[in-house]
Amino acid sequence: SSLVNLRVFNRTMGKALKWNDEFEGEVVTSLEEAVSGADVVITCTGRDEDMMEIVFADDGLYPHLKEGAIFIDHTTTSFKLAKHLNESLQEKSVKFIDAPVSGGEAGAVNGILSVMVGGDQAVLEASESLIRTYSKNITYMGQSGSGQLAKMVNQICIAGLLQGLSEGLLFAESENIDMKSLLSAISGGA
C-alpha cells in the first residue's frame, strides 16, 4: 500500500515473486534485508523449528532487528516458543506479540483472518490498524503466549467437530441412510 513500505521475504523465492506479481511490495533475498530498519516485522511460518531458524540462525533476523520495533508472529507455535521469543526480543528492546491466525489461505487472501493475540496490549493497539488490513477479527487474549493458548483451544474444537461429523456419517452409512438426504437435512439445522 502507499502508506506502508512493504518488504517481502520467503525462503521459497518463487512464492515471494508470485506474491509480488499480485501485490505491491519489494521482494528481498535475505532476512537481513527484510528487517533492517523496519518499524514492524511480521512473520508466519510452519512450525516452531522454522521460527527458531528464521529468528536465531546465523543468517537469521535477530541481530538485524531495530530497537523499538514491533514484532508480530502469526505462526501457530508452542506456548513455550512464544514465551521464549518474547523474552529474547525484550533483551533487544523489540516489542513482541504472538498472534496466531485462523481462517487458512482463503481467509488471508480475502482479508478475513481471525487473530488471537498474546502480549502487551499497548503493542497490539499500536499495530492493530495494520493487522486489520488482512483480518476481520482481532481478539486480545492476555499476556505473552495467550494467543498461542487460544489457538490451541481453537484447534481442539475443530478436531472435535471433525471427529463428531466423521462418527455421525459412519453411523449413517452403517445404517444405510441415504447420504444425500441426510446431508441436506443436517446442513439446515443445528
Language-model-derived ranges and their functions:
Residues 1-43, 75, 105:
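NAD(P)+-binding Rossmann beta1-loop-alpha1 motif at the extreme N-terminus of oxidoreductases
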Residues 31-36, 40-41, 48-113:
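Rossmann-like NAD(P)(H) cofactor-binding subdomain of soluble oxidoreductases
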Residues 2-3, 93, 176:
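Glycine-centered short loops/turns at secondary-structure junctions
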Residues 77-156:
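Rossmann-fold dinucleotide-binding core
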Residues 5, 24-26, 70, 95, ...:
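Conserved beta-strand segments of alpha/beta enzyme cores
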Residues 7, 14-18, 82-86, 92, ...:
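Catalytic-core regions of core metabolic enzymes
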Residues 146-190:
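Helical "substrate-binding/catalytic lid" subdomain
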